[in-house]
Design a protein with these regions (language model features):
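Gram-negative and organellar
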Residues: 29-408
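Bacterial N-terminal signal peptides that target proteins for export
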Residues: 2-13
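Bacterial N-terminal signal peptides
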Residues: 11-24
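Intrinsic disorder/low-complexity segments
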Residues: 1-4, 22-25
Length: 408
């Protein structure tokens, strides 16, 4: 990791303490919310390690307590959240975990039309579940530490045009040596313009990114244009597309296999040009809603190289009765190496694969604050270059409590 980034991350705990004080609102009418939440899960998993050769089954007892505090004034927003996720396996006790999640979001309108903000987060979790859900990537099961920091500024230049600038920093550290740590730094400029019809907006977004791996680095340059339209009060669509250009360097690498060391990676320099894009569709109904998102982007990964990731995600909910509603999620993704060479390691064979993930659920509202939920989740990974297909079925029963306490 570069010294500059090390220094940046070292200041993260300080920023988490100092920024709320700097952005603390002056005297004005404020709305505060304290939100406690507790979820209790009983889960059956028929392939806890997502293995093809020897799937293991187990029952898992899960508890998720969290506490959020929200502060609002006309000029200021301050959100703080702390959450835990404990998992206790019925037989595989060495897989027991206690995940942690801490978040901070603060923003202030410093003068008319200009808002500064900071988004920070620290996560401790495991790769096998969380990284697959978030990124569609299958990595060896290890603890994952994630540090993210995103300062931003937004300027409402006119009634129709808005400029925004952000500089997100992201660092991932994996326990052990099966996955490779990486860091990313991006600079992103966004511009939007609302047309005279008051429903259609045009977008432009250039960005430059720097990715550091343990055995290489990548520079990413992207330019995207797009259009968004609010067809009705309930239907909105947005589509962005553009070009990306990357320059990558990969170091020569060896891995120990018993008493020997074998070369698993040649030194390589290469550049790639391709297209990137993002789209979203939101549709609200009287008794539910439907959202769909698509993204194609150049992405860092725990494999130690950049990937091209395509992912389509759709979510729907439907209220059947006053107390019962259905919700579901479907995600389809493809992961492909940017390198011309098939980079394989002792742990991975990951050059090209497709993932499918579907999770329907029924939710019953016991009381105003308590829900009972029944989930099913099916996951599939299909490797294109080798004969390897992996399946995973999970069943969940969840008791969910959520309350909101108000104050001024």
């Amino acid at each position: 990791m570069r010294p500059k980034l090390r220094s940046y991350l070292a200041w993260l705990p300080v920023l988490l303490l100092v920024v709320p004080v700097i952005l603390w609102p002056g005297y004005s009418m404020a709305i505060q919310e304290l939100i406690p939440r507790l979820s209790l899960d009983l889960t059956y998993d028929d392939n806890i390690l997502f293995s093809r050769r020897s799937p293991q089954r187990d029952w898992i007892y899960e508890v998720r307590p969290s506490l959020s505090w929200r502060y609002r004034t006309e000029r200021d927003i301050l959100d703080v959240m702390a959450g835990l996720h404990g998992q206790k396996y019925n037989t595989e006790h060495d897989l027991d975990t206690l995940d942690q999640d801490y978040r901070l979001y603060a923003s202030r309108e410093v003068f008319f039309g200009t808002t500064i903000s900071l988004n920070a987060r620290y996560i401790l979790d495991t790769t096998l579940d969380e990284e697959f859900t978030e990124e569609g990537l299958l990595l060896s099961r290890q603890e994952r530490h994630v540090y993210s920091l995103e300062p931003a500024v937004q300027w409402q230049a006119t009634e129709r045009s808005t400029w925004a600038f952000s500089a997100p920093v992201y660092h991932v550290n994996y326990e052990g040596d099966k996955n490779q740590d990486y860091s990313t730094e991006y600079l992103t400029l966004s511009y939007s313009y609302l047309l005279d019809d008051e429903k259609t907006s045009l977008f432009a977004q250039p960005s430059v990114g720097f990715i550091d791996f343990e055995y290489g680095d990548t520079k990413v340059y992207e330019m995207m244009f797009g259009v968004g339209r609010e067809f009705t009060e309930r239907l909105f669509a947005k589509l962005m597309a553009g070009l990306s250009y990357t320059r990558s360097h990969i170091d020569e690498r060896f891995e120990p296999i018993g008493p020997f060391s074998i070369k698993v990676q040649d030194e390589e320099d290469y550049s790639k040009t391709g297209w990137v894009g993002a789209g979203e569709l939101k549709w609200d109904w009287d008794r539910g809603q439907w959202n769909m998102n698509f993204v194609r982007r150049v992405s860092a990964s725990g494999y130690g190289e950049t990937l091209i990731r395509d992912r389509l995600t759709t979510e729907a909910s439907w209220r059947i009765t006053e107390r019962i509603h259905f919700k579901g999620r479907l995600s389809i993704g493809q992961v492909k190496s940017q390198s011309d060479k098939t980079l394989r390691s002792y742990y991975y064979d990951y050059d090209d694969y497709v993932t499918y993930d579907v999770s329907p659920a029924i939710v019953y509202q016991l009381t105003e604050r308590i829900d009972v939920q029944a989930y099913y989740r099916y996951s599939l990974i299909d490797y294109k270059e080798v004969s390897d297909t992996r399946h995973r079925n999970r069943f969940f029963i969840r008791l969910d409590y959520r309350d909101v306490w108000f104050g001024q």
